[in-house]
Amino acid sequence: MNLIPTVIESTNRGERAYDIYSRLLKDRIIMLGSAIDDNVANSIVSQLLFLQAQDAEKDIYLYINSPGGSVTAGMAIYDTMQHIKPDVQTICIGMAASMGSFLLAAGAKGKRFALPNAEVMIHQPLGGAQGQATEIEIAARHILKTREKLNRILAERTGQPIEKIEKDTDRDNFLTADEAKAYGLIDEVMHPAE
């Protein structure tokens, strides 16, 4: 069962109940806390566009705890993040894997973070094909083009040479928050205020 907490907010017009995600959205916080599919992407994209319409100058905060998911759905989020005017700060909590790590790296330069115990995992895109040999060949060419595109963007976002990205994403590659910073996937590890 998936319960969504409700918060009560008192205003001069009385009390108002919000689901927690709507309340966070008021503070320009978007939660990506699941696998990425078309429905999740549509929700994230809608929230990004809404927050831009509200104020195109203020940063948006995208918290990521995701195992990844659909490449096309993730690219819809990525393209929107790059298209809108506000900077999108990305913060990894828990795990940002696969497309989740790609979106983490897609945040505004200097504004990509991870909590100290967060993990980041990068790898090449997954896919499968069935059907006639020609259909399998078409699918294979497509996934190779997709891998090339993702690797090129990751190289741009991290500052790593494309050859290193290709090697490092050949298999699941798990990084600690500090390793993700050294790699260029994030800019800072967030530590508690002292």
From Swiss-Prot:
Cross-referenced HAMAP family, in alphabetical order? ClpP
Localisation: Cytoplasm
InterPro entries reported for this sequence = ClpP, ClpP/crotonase-like_dom_sf, ClpP/TepA, ClpP_His_AS, ClpP_Ser_AS
Q: Where are the catalytic residues?
A: S98 (nucleophile), H123
Q: Which GO terms describe its cellular component?
A: cytoplasm; endopeptidase Clp complex
Keywords, in A-Z order: Cytoplasm, Hydrolase, Protease, Serine protease
Could you tell me what reaction this enzyme catalyses? Answer: Hydrolysis of proteins to small peptides in the presence of ATP and magnesium. alpha-casein is the usual test substrate. In the absence of ATP, only oligopeptides shorter than five residues are hydrolyzed (such as succinyl-Leu-Tyr-|-NHMec, and Leu-Tyr-Leu-|-Tyr-Trp, in which cleavage of the -Tyr-|-Leu- and -Tyr-|-Trp bonds also occurs)
Record carries keyword Hydrolase: yes
**Superkingdom to which the source organism belongs:** Bacteria
Q: Which gene encodes it?
A: clpP
Q: What is this protein called?
A: ATP-dependent Clp protease proteolytic subunit
Which EC number applies? 3.4.21.92
Query: What GO terms are given for molecular function?
Result: ATP-dependent peptidase activity; ATPase binding; serine-type endopeptidase activity
Per the UniProt record, the source organism is Macrococcus caseolyticus (strain JCSC5402)
So what does this one do?
Cleaves peptides in various proteins in a process that requires ATP hydrolysis. Has a chymotrypsin-like activity. Plays a major role in the degradation of misfolded proteins.
Q: What is the lineage of its organism?
A: Bacteria, Bacillati, Bacillota, Bacilli, Bacillales
- Give the UniProt family note: Belongs to the peptidase S14 family.
Is Protease among the key words of this record? yes
Uppermost EC category: hydrolase
Q: Name one GO biological process term.
A: protein quality control for misfolded or incompletely synthesized proteins
Q: What quaternary structure, including any partners, is listed in this protein's UniProt entry?
A: Fourteen ClpP subunits assemble into 2 heptameric rings which stack back to back to give a disk-like structure with a central cavity, resembling the structure of eukaryotic proteasomes.
